[in-house]
Swiss-Prot record:
GO terms for molecular function: magnesium ion binding; nucleic acid binding; RNA-DNA hybrid ribonuclease activity. It comes from Shewanella sediminis (strain HAW-EB3). The keyword Metal-binding applies. This is Ribonuclease H. It catalyses: Endonucleolytic cleavage to 5'-phosphomonoester. Mg(2+) 2 binds at residues 12, 136. One of its GO terms (cellular component) is cytoplasm. InterPro entries: RNase_H, RNaseH-like_sf, RNaseH_domain, RNaseH_sf, RNaseHI. Endonuclease that specifically degrades the RNA of RNA-DNA hybrids.
Amino acid sequence: MMGMKQLSIFTDGSCLGNPGPGGYGVVMKYKQHTKEIADGFLLTTNNRMELLAPIIALEALKVPCKIVLTSDSQYMRQGITQWIHGWKKKGWITSSKQPVKNVDLWKRLDLASKGHEIDWRWVKGHAGHVENERCDTLAREAAEAKPKQEDIGYQA
């Protein structure tokens, strides 16, 4: 599509205890502009926060964009680029005939991705990648801030 805005999104999730208090961090870059988003939850898991971070970033966009989305979560990246196709065909059941974990967030991420051209990239965590380190700090600080907000979809 001609004239799509091109931006970079970096995401990370954190959880103290897993399950426990958790948070996500997002850094969005468009031209010379940078926006940071973070929030925390009372009880959640690291995987839920790794999924929620790109959801929040993508839901913040008002128009279809060309995006390079970088995360240190193989779970999120493989899920959205590979596993989700089979899950949808099988009615959100895994290859081992179990319900897909975090299905509420996978459906939301799938929906939030629509209309965008996304290059899903993985980066090794805690390896000095500036934006990933910033996301990690945002996510950890949100988790450590004694969040009261409930992660509605989390099931212990």
